[in-house]
Structure formats: structure tokens, C-alpha cells
Amino acid sequence: MSSKNEIWKNEALISALKTIEKNYGKEALVVYNEGDDIDHDVISSGSFLIDQAIGIGGYPKGRVVEIFGPESSGKTTLALHAIAEAQKQGEIAAFIDAEHSLDLNYAKKIGVDINSLLVSQPSYGEEALDILETLVKSNSISLIVVDSVAALVPKTELEGEMSDQSIGLQARMMSKALRKLNGVISKSKTTVIFINQLREKIGIMFGNPETTTGGRALKFFSTLRIEVRKGESLIENGIVVANKVKVKVVKNKVAVPFKQTLITIGYDKGIERINEIIELATLYNILDKSGVWYSYEKEKIGQGKNAVKEWLNKNPDKLSKIEFELKEFIEKS
């Protein structure tokens, strides 16, 4: 294996490097040092369980992420939680609402600061993607959500007649946009989350008949592809109060793929983070459990999860400390 010292002894290579630097700048080609930080900067998903499934503690910065699934499965909720987490770190987030369906009241309830959220409601697909490109190139936005790919309708299709053929227009538009965007997204360290829907393939007799909209380009350029599916409903006093949601990482370029988890999304509350904290803190022995009794640092909390929830809500300093410990465990694992 060639060492770094041997690289600088190769005169032909040094000449090539100088030519590349002259034409394209110093950052066009680099050699990393032993002590350089190669860990991924991330934005938390807002769910400890999802952060753990992703494998690096959240959505990687400077990458494309696709969250897809059937309708009403929790896709937008996951994206809004990511926005809330970015804002907690003092970063700027944007929401490109191609569906024109963003519920600001719901976003506020799950922690989004709507007063500092940039929102665009474009009229057609090219406009949405141009806005996305401009925001990414500003190098000022940490997270951009596009909701959704299915709603990115090309201008030609919108202005044409209902009888006009428009096969492949959206796929070509997405392919061109992602080819242009991929490099600048990486350089700007912007995380771009595309929300996508599932469609039925026509005439499929064998295999999975479901596919995502927008062609194959998004599948190719995405670092993470996360599938979400609604599971059982949780009912209290005859009223549905929450849903179990299965989250599966079907593509992962930064950690081991195909990990999956089960989260709970409450109506008007979003991801039930406290339940996750109790589950994982018990798993990692941060919380001690003996039978039905829970304790923390030898302090008895009470019997059952409801007692722990109440205790955590009354002791925000202890909650913050447990969250910090959990993040350390997830990063190490």
C-alpha cells in the first residue's frame, strides 16, 4: 500500500495534481490525514429508534434521503420531526410544499418553529426543483424537505390537454435535477429529504407490484431510503389515539442496511419519544428495572411505564441527562 510520503515523491502525479488544482481549485482532489474527522455529521430524526436503525445517529448531512410509503403512513410526520431537530441546533430548515397541504398547526404541535421555517408552495415541478437548487447553493440551509415527489408535475403536463401523452416526463425531470443537485448538496452539507408515495405497477404477475413515483434516479442518488408503513391502531376509550408505524431502512450507504424498528405516532403529538426513551434506557441499563419497578441512579421511580412517564415529565433535568446518555450509547453502537 502506498503511503502519503510516496505520493509526494511521484513527480508525474504531483504535476497532475497541480493541473487539477489550477483548473478546478484546491478542494477538487484531497488526501486525508490520519487525524482527520471522517465521522458523519447528522441531523437527528427525532426518534431514538430510527436514529439507531439508521446506524449513525440520524440523517447524514450533505446527502439525499427518500422517505416513502403508502398514504397516511407517517412520512410527513417524520420529515417535520427532522425539521424540529435541525431548528433545535440553531439551523435553518425549508419545506417545499408541492402538495399544498402543509398543516402548520400540526407542525407546531410536534415542535417545529413555524416562525423560522421557510415554506414554498410551487405551482409546478420545475419551479420546485429550481427553488430547491437555489436554496442548496446558498450554503445557508441545513435541511430541505420536498413533499412530495408525486406532486412534482412537469409544467408541460400541467399546460397540456388531458388527452396529451406525458409518459416519462416526470422521470426525466427528476433525473436531470438530481444529476445537477447531487454535487452541490454534498458541498453545501445540506440534507435533502424527498417524501415519496407508492404506486401499483401495471401488469405485474410476480414479485412486488409496488413502486415509487418519479423514476429510478431518486433511488440511485439517495444515500438513505426509508420505508414507512402504518401498523396497528392504539385505542383508548373507543378512540384511536396513536398508530404503530414500521420503519425499515431499505438502502443505506453510511451504515448496515435493512435494519427496521417500530415507532408510535400519536395524533396531534407526533412520535412518542418518551416511550422510546423508556424502552432504550431500560435496554441499555440506564434505567434499572426489577419486576415492574423502575429506578434511576438508585432513586426509585415507580411501578410501570406510566409512572416513569410522569416522573420524566416532572424532572426535565433527569430527562435531558438520560437523553444524553442514550445518544452516547447509540453513537457507540
Swiss-Prot record:
The keyword Lipid biosynthesis does not apply. Its main location: cytoplasm. One of its GO terms (cellular component) is cytosol. It is found in: Cytoplasm. Pfam families: RecA (PF00154), RecA_C (PF21096). CDD domains: RecA. GO terms for molecular function: ATP binding; ATP hydrolysis activity; ATP-dependent DNA damage sensor activity; damaged DNA binding; single-stranded DNA binding. ATP binds at G69, P70, E71, S72, S73, G74, K75, T76. Disulfide bonds: none annotated. GO terms for biological process: DNA recombination; DNA repair; SOS response. Keywords: ATP-binding, Cytoplasm, DNA damage, DNA recombination, DNA repair, DNA-binding, Nucleotide-binding, SOS response. Signal peptide: none annotated. Belongs to the RecA family. Can catalyze the hydrolysis of ATP in the presence of single-stranded DNA, the ATP-dependent uptake of single-stranded DNA by duplex DNA, and the ATP-dependent hybridization of homologous single-stranded DNAs. It interacts with LexA causing its activation and leading to its autocatalytic cleavage. PANTHER family: MITOCHONDRIAL DNA REPAIR PROTEIN RECA HOMOLOG-RELATED, RECA. This is Protein RecA. It comes from Mesoplasma florum (strain ATCC 33453 / NBRC 100688 / NCTC 11704 / L1) (Acholeplasma florum). The gene is recA.
